Amino acid sequence: KCSLHINTMQSNLSYKAVENKDADLGLITNPHFFKKVQTIPLFEEQLVFVCGGDAPYQDGLLPSQLDSADEIYIPWSNTFLMWHDYWFGNDPEVKVMLDNIALLRQLLDLKNTWAIMPATLGRKLAEKENCRIVSIENGPEYRTCYAIMNDQRSEHPLIDDFLNELLKTVGNIPEIRLL
């Protein structure tokens, strides 16, 4: 019998949970070094620029043309943070800072607002909502998803089964590249 419990937590807390054997597996986007935890790259996904359907942005947009005061900011990964700091400074004024996507869709209805987000989420919003994906030059790097697990993972063959099914599923998503 297998029981699946899913908890959302920051990457560093996921590492501690795996290291302390409070969790068998973690899926993270910000890798760290922990002696007793393996970090395995699984897949990567492009981050895209998304705005409301009526926003004035056009394809070929440059980050230097953007006003961070119109941004709905979510810190997707460390590489995204470096890109963002490069273009907008270390402490830019943003319209809204979120730590999850619950309010993201509604906030994109505000005038001239924009957000950077994973391509799969952007595609869903563009297909089902009044949103658009706009191509951006010099955009952020792909976001990598990693599996983290205890060094003694061979004790849990279900982890390998789960990861194989996960990769088979996400491998069919056009915006995702398996690693």
Which sequence ranges carry the predicted segments?
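A late-sequence structural motif
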Residues: 135-176
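Beta-alpha-beta core module
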Residues: 34-41, 45, 103-152
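Conserved functional loop/turn residues at catalytic and ligand-binding sites
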Residues: 17, 21-22, 41, 70, ...
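Short hydrophobic/charged patches on amphipathic alpha-helices used for structural packing
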Residues: 15, 19, 39, 63, ...
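Secondary-structure junction motif
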Residues: 57, 67-91, 155-159, 163, ...
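Short secondary-structure boundary segments
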Residues: 30-31, 53-54, 76-78, 119-121
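Flexible hinge/capping segments at coil-to-helix
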Residues: 36-75
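Central regulatory/effector-binding core of bacterial HTH transcription factors
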Residues: 1-34, 98
